[in-house]
Structures are given as structure tokens and as C-alpha cells.
Amino acid sequence: MLDLTYEAPKPKVIAGAKHDWELVIGMEIHAQVSSNAKLFSGASTTFGAEPNSNVSFVDCAMPGMLPVINEFCVAQAVRTGLGLKAQINLFSAFDRKNYFYPDLPQGYQISQLYHPIVGEGEVLVEMAPGIARLVRIERIHLEQDAGKSIHDMDPNLSFVDFNRTGVALMEIVSRPDIRGPEEAAAYVAKLRQILRYLGTCDGNMQNGNLRADVNVSVCRPGQYEKYQETQDFSHLGTRCEIKNMNSMRFIQQAIDYEARRQIAILEDGGKVVQETRLYDPDKGETRSMRSKEEAHDYRYFPDPDLLPLEIEQGWVDEIAASMPELPDAKKARFMADYGVTDYDANVLTAELEAAAYFEEVARGRDGKQAANWVINELFGRLNKQGLTIADTPVKAGQLGGVLDLIASGEISGKMAKDLFEILWTEGGDPAEVAAARGMKQVTDTGAIETAVDEIIAANPAQVEKAKANPKLAGWFVGQVIKATGGKANPAAVNQIVAEKLGL
């Protein structure tokens, strides 16, 4: 396991006009369950389908249609809970959250208020190498997503697309343990990474498959410690919720603006109103959406169409037995097995596909060299062209072949980069391409000695300088490699130059 030092949350202190203030942040992450069917119907969850084409009679609340729980969605929620080291509740139940909105055909949302499927868990957020913060998870519950209202197609009409209606969501609720914008973004990034490793949510924020509601409040220094002692939320100040954030950068910007807005109100002698707000990235500010409702405003009651959900411990154990290696464990293994640095291990394990690619390249080879090539050459080229690891034209086997040619001494590092470029644009087998292009390193010491002798004979003044300052011998090495068209083995050239110059 990773050798981590746990650090108490460090609040971001914001200087107001009159006082210092501290930030307190809690988050509700809405993660769309990776499932081919919706939570209570068999309708497809395919993104980007024609409007209102993925809608069943259950989704659009036709009379007499009853919901039927999707067992796979339940398993995905359990898997998520296990991945977050959370308590799995063998008994849970669904409730109706009553409110009217055009994209909610039933007039209520099926959720889990009183008996969620997953209880308390945790997420470790590494803020610096070896330094981790613990963010506690309060609960995870299953619920339906709503549809999508569209207001910009006609100046006089609004439209509703019910394709998303009834899609399964996991709402992952944190404790108010987050103390700054950067930590909030890091928490979302770590949670997204875990969900993607688990295969329970694809984490695509652009498509709305992972959305964050951010609860922000400010308090005077020392008040948070009183909350920790008493668990009395009144010490934390009045919170405002910023809805539907789908960007790490916007999350940070919204928190920073909202904190300063609340501080200005309090220092002017006003009171912060508990409300739901939206973030406008164009203006860089939050704006009021509606007053913040409490649970009683929604008139929650148990859904009479759904029996309580009772699962067996044996089924939970089966899911636990099939759990994949998670990011922290994979990072620790990469550092131990392949000798990569903490930074490189973070980069290599950021995405599951990238970690698999690296491991295929590194297996049986120099791990540090493999990491250097994957991060600097491959990832650098992918980022430059805006591609993902799935789009790479150089497969892991091909890059491994390049490293094998370097290890055998057949090609130099410079040749390897030229070969990588050819594989990127044209493809092919590395060994065959190198042979066809004459990319073979000169290792014949006789040929190298001849080249060294010629360079030394032609540059007597440079010879005297090199003897006086051995660091200048590198000039001869460069000239020899240049004279051989870049094919001379650098190690052999260095050795022969040193011998010839008597260094």
C-alpha cells in the first residue's frame, strides 16, 4: 500500500475587509451509473440518441406502469460503496421526492432518503507527494435522473427531452471536510478516477454523467473546530448550494466567488440566505436560482410501488471478490515493481487505460525507461494532438519493440525517437522498419576508432583544450556521432575518445 502521511484539512483563509474567514465545503456528486438500461425500466441509456427515443411507458409515467428495479444498477452501487470503503446496507428502501417540474413526468423523483443503500465511507485525496487528506463520505443513494428542458430552440416555446428520465444516478454525499477550492477539485478528480477504475460511472463531465453540487459556507477561524467537537452545523455558517457543476476549473472558480460574496454580505452586517445558486462561467459569478428547500418541503414518503430492497451478504461478498485493483493500490505497485517515481506513478495511473498501456510496455523491461517513453514521448504527442490513449497509433507492443531495440544496442536513443515518429505516422513492426530504413547503430569499434582518429588529427588545437579541460571531450563525441550519421554507439564513442585523448 501507499506510504501516506495523513494531514488535517488546511482551511483556505480569505482576508475580508474586516476579518479573516475560513471556507467550509461539502459536495454531492451525481454519478450516472454505467448501465445499458435505466433504474426502473428497460429503456436504453445511450447518450446522444434522437430526443425522446429512449423512453419507456414507465419513464413517461403512463397510467398503470410500475417500476421494476434494475439489479445491475444495485450491484454497481454496491461496487462503488466497496471501492470507497463504505458500509453496505443490506436493507434499503426507495422514497418519493415530490416536486413539479416539466422534465419530471411522474411529479416525483424516486430516491432514497431514509434508508440509503450505502453508508459511511471515505476518499483519500493526495494533495502533495505522500501527503493525503481524508474526506468522509456520509452516504450513497440511488435515484432517478430527470429529463432535459430545452429553451433555445424556439423563442416562444420550451421543449422536453425525456431520454435521460429514469437513468440511474448514484448521489455520493460528502461530509463538510473540504476546506478549499483546490481540495474540492482534487476530491472530484479522485472520486472520478475511482469510479472509472470500478467501471460504475464513465465520469464524462462534458456529457453530464458526473455532476457536482457544491455546498459553500464561510466561518470565522476557530468555528470549524467547534463544529468538530459538537457536530453542531450552526458553527459553520449558512451554506449555499451551487448546482450542476461539470468542470474542475469551474468548481474552483465558483467556490472562490461564492465565498467572497458571502464574506461581503456578512461584513456589511447582512445575513447569508440559504439558497440554491448557479454558476455563470462567462461572468465568473454565481446567481440565485431558488430558495434552498429542506427535506420536509419535498414531502418524502416511502414509494408504495417498490418493496424495500433487501440484499444478502453473500451477494455483496461475490461483488467484493470481483473488485479490480484501485488507483492507490496500482500506484503503490508501480512504484514497488517498476521503480517509478511518485510523480510518474500518479501520471501513469491517472487513467485505467493509460496504466494498462504502461504495464504492457514495462513488463519484462526497464520500468523507469518505459515510464519515461510513455509519459514524455507518447503522452506528450497525444496531448499535443488532442488524442486519448485509445486513439494512439503506436500500440504498446510497438513501443515495447522500440525499447527492445535500444536495450540490444541496435539503435540509439536518437534513432529510437526517429523510429517512434515513423511508427506514429506510418505504423509497422519496429524491427522491420528499423532494418528497412538502415537505422542500425555502429558498434564496430574499429570503424569508430577510425572516425575518432580522423577528428583528432584534424583538430589539434581542440585536442589541447580537451586535455586541459576534460569536459571539452564531449565536442569530439558529438563530431564523431555526426560523422557517422548519428549511428555510432554513444557509449563506445565516449570510451574511445577518452582513451585516445588520454583522459
From Swiss-Prot:
What Pfam families does the annotation carry? GatB_N, GatB_Yqey
> Which keywords does this Swiss-Prot/TrEMBL entry list?
ATP-binding, Ligase, Nucleotide-binding, Protein biosynthesis
Task: Give the enzyme's EC designation.
Answer: 6.3.5.-
PROSITE patterns the UniProt entry points to: GATB (PS01234)
The catalysed reaction is: L-glutamyl-tRNA(Gln) + L-glutamine + ATP + H2O = L-glutaminyl-tRNA(Gln) + L-glutamate + ADP + phosphate + H(+); L-aspartyl-tRNA(Asn) + L-glutamine + ATP + H2O = L-asparaginyl-tRNA(Asn) + L-glutamate + ADP + phosphate + 2 H(+)
- UniProt keyword Iron-sulfur present: no
Q: Which SUPFAM superfamilies does the protein's record reference?
A: GatB/YqeY motif, Glutamine synthetase/guanido kinase
BP terms from Gene Ontology:
glutaminyl-tRNAGln biosynthesis via transamidation; translation
**InterPro entries the record matches:** Asn/Gln-tRNA_amidoTrfase_suB/E, Asn/Gln-tRNA_Trfase_suB/E_cat, Asn/Gln_amidotransferase, Asn/Gln_tRNA_amidoTrase-B-like, GatB, GatB_C_1, GatB_Yqey_C_2, Gln-tRNA_amidoTrfase_suB_CS
Q: Name one GO molecular function term.
A: asparaginyl-tRNA synthase (glutamine-hydrolyzing) activity
User: What role does it play?
Assistant: Allows the formation of correctly charged Asn-tRNA(Asn) or Gln-tRNA(Gln) through the transamidation of misacylated Asp-tRNA(Asn) or Glu-tRNA(Gln) in organisms which lack either or both of asparaginyl-tRNA or glutaminyl-tRNA synthetases. The reaction takes place in the presence of glutamine and ATP through an activated phospho-Asp-tRNA(Asn) or phospho-Glu-tRNA(Gln).
Subunit composition and interactions? Heterotrimer of A, B and C subunits.
Family to which the UniProt record says this protein belongs: Belongs to the GatB/GatE family. GatB subfamily.
Q: Which NCBIfam families match?
A: gatB, PRK05477.1-2, PRK05477.1-4, PRK05477.1-5
Q: Tell me the PANTHER family matching this sequence.
A: GLUTAMYL-TRNA GLN AMIDOTRANSFERASE SUBUNIT B MITOCHONDRIAL AND PROKARYOTIC PET112-RELATED, GLUTAMYL-TRNA(GLN) AMIDOTRANSFERASE SUBUNIT B, MITOCHONDRIAL
Name this protein carries in UniProt: Aspartyl/glutamyl-tRNA(Asn/Gln) amidotransferase subunit B
